[in-house]
Each structure stands twice: as C-alpha cells, then as structure tokens.
C-alpha cells in the first residue's frame, strides 16, 4: 500500500496565521491517522518579502502547538534548478511556448474585451502559434518573454475528484494559456508547487478552497509532466461575521498564532478549536485529546461551506472567538495540576512572582492553590494578573470608596 505523504507549504512573508495552522493541523491529523508523513516545505521564492524572522516564527509556532513534521523543513529556493528544468521540458515537448506580449498590450486587449462585453477576457493566444523563426527573430531583438503553458485545445471538460467537494469540472475552453515562468527566468508558484510535490512524492493535497483555480491548472501540469495526480481535498475557508476572509489587514494580531501564545492560551486548546472550524465529528463532542482527534478525524466529515470565526473588534470581554476562550477554560480546569503548574510557572516568572520554593517544599501549597483558583480564570495570564494576590509578597488592596 502506498505511503500517505502530505505537506504544509507556508510562505515566509509574515507571521504564522491561524488559517495556516488549521491547514497544517488537518494535514498532520491525516498523516497520523494513516501512518504517513507530513513534510514541511517553506515556499520562499518571493525573495523580496521572505524573511528569516518569518521562517523562525513558522517553525517556533508549529513546535509550540505540537504539530510535528517528519521531513524538512525544505526550502523551495533550494530546488530552483528542478523548476527551470521542468519548464524547459515543457518547452521542448511543445507543451509550453514563449510569449512576447507586453503588459501594456495585454492590458489594452483586456480593456477592449471588457468594453465589448466579451465573455472571455483572458489571454487570446497571440504567441501560441509563432514559428521557430519568429521566436528567434524576437529573441534577437532582445524582446523579453514569459513562458506560457499551452492548454490542450480539447472538447469537453477537465476534472478531478475532490475528497471534500466531489467531482470538480471545468471546460478546457475556459482555461487560458497561463504563465509558468516570468520574463526574468524565474518559474511561478503554479509550476514550482507541482514540481516539488512530484519530487516529494505527495499523495494527498489538503488545502483551502481559495486554491481551486490553481488546482485546475496544476492538474494539467501533472499530466504534461507525466506524473500521477495526487488526491485533492479543498477545505472551506474561515470568514468573519461579515463574511470576509480573516486576515491581519482586516482583523489585526488576533489571527496570528503569536497572539494566543502571548495571551496565555494552552497550545492544544487552540488546535482543538481550529479543528472545529470546517470539520465536525458527527456528534456533539467538541473537546478532543490528541489521540481522540487523530482517531476521529476524517475528510468525509469536512464541511463544504465556509466556517465563521466569531470575532468582534473592540469587545474587551471576548477578545477572540468566545468558543476558543471556553475551550481554553476547559483545559485550564481539567488538566493535570502538575502540568498546569509548569505552564503557570512561566507566567509567574515573567511577572517576577515565581518563588523557587514553589518547586520544592512549597510545591504542595502551590499546586493546591492552583486547583482552588483555576476555575475563575480564562487564560494562563490570569494567574499572574487576576491571581497576583496569591503569589506576590506584597499586594496592595484598593480601599472601597
């Protein structure tokens, strides 16, 4: 039986996003359930925006959450030669061609097509039928060129079977010849992604529905490169109450993993919450241990409709989704006291409230106190703020007016 191999390919151009973590989590669960492997691949081809700080944030965030990978991290830029070689193979086999159309010319054609209310405003194939002599002439003139994939001019539809959405079809005539290599010679994401997945022997691609336009094109690339098509599963997106995709631009730090780390959330509580955004076990159960979730997870239970992140900016009580706060409270109140003691210690140390005796002769008192007060708190931070009186040597009480 073929080994299950999935991947999480974040782009290191910013913080680790909870949407990205949800993707990593679902891939991790699927790999664990099937005895497979999760590959971490950093897609760092955007050299201007990629940063080492973002790479560190991705790795540290996943480690904090306990989402472990079996191979990697690999870096996409390390395999640039593979991507270029694949593009040349497609050129040589006649499945791709050089396009010398300028951006200005393409924009003029697009605007004209829109003005005439044409149904198709994509690339019109101007350079598709250039003769070798015409190509050589343009190259001799120093005219820059991109490389476009030559979409087969077939009747009917291209399709793939999606594990979440079922059979996905699109007419060949609706897919324009798309760019796979920029005029500077650098291959685009569409091609790089496929080449890397083929090399890494990826069997299942579990990702958001916002990638579906890419998938249609990538199906053609798999075929052209003579590779077996992986199984696709497109997850629903996570939107806010106004049906907007959650993002830092619209929602601020609340969508960053670091926000929850800084605010004293228990790592698995965040994972537990995220798995419920777009997936359900078919029962009323909402609290899962790692082992329970690995056993219960199934792509067949993935929702086809978008999930909602219930966040209201400016709400001081519910500074994130209330369900996430409730799940975190559950873990605070039910986890082993010794384990809780380790987590709270970090918070007390940050506030200079930690006493070394709490790990020695005062440990029974320390753990007993945590057991008495934990039902009042929402996050680990609360032990060092609202619970400060229990651990401070001196604590001033404001007199009532």
Each predicted region: which residue ranges?
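N-terminal Rossmann-like or analogous alpha/beta NTP/dinucleotide-binding catalytic cores
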Residues: 1-116, 213-227, 269
